Amino acid sequence: MESKKKMLFIFNPFSGKAQIKSKLFEIIDVFVKGGYEVIVHPTQAVGDGFEKTKELAPQVDLVVCSGGDGTLDEVVSGLMEVDQRVPIGYIPAGSTNDPLPSDR
């Protein structure tokens, strides 16, 4: 039996207006149907996304995070800390959903 790819999904349950909670099943279902075994971690405090990413990134094939720019920063910083070249996905769910400045 072929082993499934593993994915870490880190999300901030309080980011923005906490609307991510109503979409969790749909998000996880998409990745499961895509062949991933999904490890789900809702952040509990500032810095939690960083620590969980450092802990689990060496064990997964993909990291996806959802939240605001702080959540994205923690996950990217965690990957950099352990020097893991794991693809990363981002589902914006912060109050402004604009992690990068624009010239518009």
Where are these regions (language model features)?
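Small-residue-rich beta-alpha loop regions that form the catalytic core of phosphotransfer
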Residues: 2-104
